[in-house]
Regions:
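Juxtamembrane helix-loop junctions of ABC transporter transmembrane domains
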Residues: 15-25, 56-72, 93-141, 145, ...
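Helix-loop-helix
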Residues: 73-75, 89, 179-196, 267-336, ...
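ABC-type nucleotide-binding domain
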Residues: 357-618
């Protein structure tokens, strides 16, 4: 029975809603309000239960005071005769209070405490997946993930503190005030003095705790980001023997974090001391005033007992209120810190009327495209390029000429400032991003694999592919030879072996062959190769080239390579400099022109593009 009740409450909120999350509004309370959509009803239910808990707890003290009066007014023989029904009613009230508290706990713990932050993480994660590449070039991946996790918990705690602690305290104090004034209005005086003193502590110390918490959250994110950055690039750290340097780099952020920790602990000590002084004054003042009123016959013993018990309860509550308030401001600081990242609007969005891309021929057009990564530093200016259906085009140029930028714009990783880019007459900004990238296969020199199995990484290209199709792609990519010999720390082997973060357990050539297998399995009509074989040795490259040639049949291809021999057989070669086309034609045509391409071909060393050739500004 209990398990069924728990299960019912646990299933009231869907932790993984299918609806696409909306970018939260900026401003603390607007941010919180937009993120509690779908759970507001249960937050209100929790508040209602909390109101009941506050009222019933205050009434319990009143009942205890009455019992004290009855014990003084009746003998053991007459007490149960005269007040038996009242005592039974009191016991029934206690039983009802227990049931009420149980269901309040179910709402708090089963419905909200665990499920609500998971719902937030799910939505935040999907929001971050929708951010552009430019966003992640300005942010530590570790820092973003830390904010997703921390902000979800902090936002949950802010909401539940308000719905639970704040509501409970207000209701408890109001009910207690009514009860005490029914005995004698003077009994409220110590509580009013306590509230003034407590409010002053809250006014001066709690906001400082909140500001310190905000600095601490930022320092924690920075520390996490730096540590994660070192782990993510451990090969580079080892290669340059910079373990000590990275430790010092992380230590700097740890020291900054410790500054905020010490500041927080100093405030906590002041808070504890001031709280003790105010609480002790309340207990002593209430007891003394109660005795004085009893001495003058204005209240009975039960009223003194009730007031003293309430003062002791407030004494205990004050620690709860103080630290919950401190946590509230700390969590508000964390939410504010996370809000700066999580509420950033997506810079690249699908239009409301966006349709799926339909590739029928594979014609690609760049028309009057202007683009710059930084304002005032144009990379492409009035750029035009027409790639015919099924044409194989090679892009040549030194670093920074705009080759990879053309690829990134076609994939709509970035938006041009002006001009249009289209595929088969459909502009890339008028179709959905998912459908656009689903029709394009990309292999780059900087191949990153997911920290999953080899099978998962290959089948990522087409999740509905069969095992046989996946293995066939690995064979065509010359990867089937080494995959059976792979193993990981957990004993998984072959296609089940995990490749490590970003594929760190594999060699560069192995990573690139798995990436090529992934694209072969995807079999998209448009193929982009950005130094696709740069990490392969000559023997493997020669073996895989035939498979690449077969894969390129019937596809529109854009290939980038510094090693000119790898793209010399393309239908058309385009030489770029500073975002402009300065030569184009087939390999034979360009050699016959005796222009820049011919000089590059002649000056190649080992087949690679020389950076020492004088670039012409035609």
């Amino acid at each position: 029975m209990i398990k069924k009740i728990f299960s019912w409450f646990e299933s009231r909120i869907d932790p993984y809603p299918e609806a696409a999350p909306k970018t939260p509004e900026k401003g603390l309370w607007r941010f919180i309000w937009s993120n509690i959509e779908g759970v507001r009803k249960w937050i209100a239910v929790l508040a209602v239960f909390t109101v009941g808990v506050g009222i019933m707890e205050a009434l319990m003290f009143q009942f205890m005071g009455k019992v004290v009066d009855w014990l003084g007014a009746y003998t053991p023989q007459t007490l149960f005769v005269e007040k038996g029904h009242a005592l039974i009613g009191m016991m029934a009230m206690v039983a009802f209070f227990a049931v009420w508290t149980f269901f309040a706990s179910c709402v708090r713990l089963q419905t909200l405490q665990g499920v609500f932050p998971m719902r937030l993480r799910w939505n935040f994660h999907r929001l971050m997946l929708g951010q552009s590449l430019g966003f992640y070039q300005d942010e530590f991946a570790g820092r973003v993930s830390a904010k997703v996790m921390q902000t979800a918990l902090a936002l949950r705690d802010v909401v539940m503190t308000v719905a639970d602690m704040v509501v409970y305290v207000l209701v408890y104090f109001i009910t207690s005030g009514v009860i005490l004034s029914s005995f004698d209005v003077w009994l409220i005086l110590p509580f009013i003095c306590w509230m003034i003193g407590f409010a002053m502590i809250m006014r001066f110390l709690i906001p400082k705790l909140g500001k310190t918490a905000a600095r601490q959250a930022d320092a924690r994110s920075l520390m996490t980001g730096r540590i994660t950055d070192a782990y993510s690039n451990i090969a580079t750290v080892k290669l340059f023997s910079h373990g000590a340097r990275e430790a010092a780099y992380a230590k700097q952020s740890m020291e900054e974090f410790m500054v905020t920790v010490h500041a927080q602990m100093r405030l906590a000590t002041l808070l504890h001391t001031c709280s003790f002084i105010v609480n002790s004054s309340l207990t002593v003042g209430t007891t003394a005033l109660g005795i004085w009123l009893w001495y003058h016959g204005q209240v009975g013993v039960g009223a003194v007992a009730t007031a003293t018990a309430m003062a002791l309860r407030v004494n205990g509550l004050s620690q709860y209120i103080m630290w919950e308030s401190a946590r509230l401001f700390e969590n508000i600081g964390t939410v504010n810190d996370g809000m700066a990242t999580l509420s950033k609007p997506h810079t690249i969005l699908d239009k409301p009327q966006a349709l799926p891309l339909k590739v029928t021929r594979g014609e690609i057009k760049f028309e009057h495209v202007d683009f710059s990564y930084e304002a005032g530093k144009p990379l492409l200016n009035g750029f035009n390029l027409n790639i015919k259906p099924g044409e194989k085009v090679g892009l040549i140029g030194r670093s920074g000429a705009g080759k990879s930028t053309i690829v990134n714009l076609l994939l709509r990783f970035y938006e041009p400032q002006s001009g249009t880019i289209s595929i088969d007459g459909q502009t890339v900004d008028s179709v959905t991003q998912e459908s656009l990238r689903a029709q394009i296969g990309l292999v780059t020199q900087d191949t990153s694999l997911l920290h999953r199995s080899v099978r998962d990484n290959i089948i990522y290209g087409r999740p509905d592919a069969t095992e046989a199709e996946m293995i066939s792609a690995a064979e065509r990519a010359e990867a089937a030879g080494f995959i059976p010999n792979l193993s990981d720390a957990k004993g998984r082997r072959g296609y089940d072996a995990h490749v490590g973060e970003r594929g760190v357990k594999l060699s560069g050539g192995q990573r690139q062959r798995i990436a090529i297998a992934r694209v072969m399995l995807k079999d998209a009509p448009i193929l982009l190769l950005d130094e696709a074989t740069s990490a392969l040795d000559s023997e493997v490259e020669a073996a895989i080239q035939e498979s690449l040639d077969k894969m390129m049949e019937g596809k529109t291809v854009i290939a980038i390579a510094h090693r000119l021999s790898t793209i010399a057989a393309m239908d058309r070669l385009i030489v770029l400099d500073k975002g402009r086309i300065i030569e184009e034609g087939s390999h034979t045509e360009l050699l016959a022109k005796q222009g820049l391409y011919a000089k590059l071909w002649a000056h190649q060393s080992g087949g690679f593009l020389s950076e020492h050739v004088e670039w012409e500004n035609n």
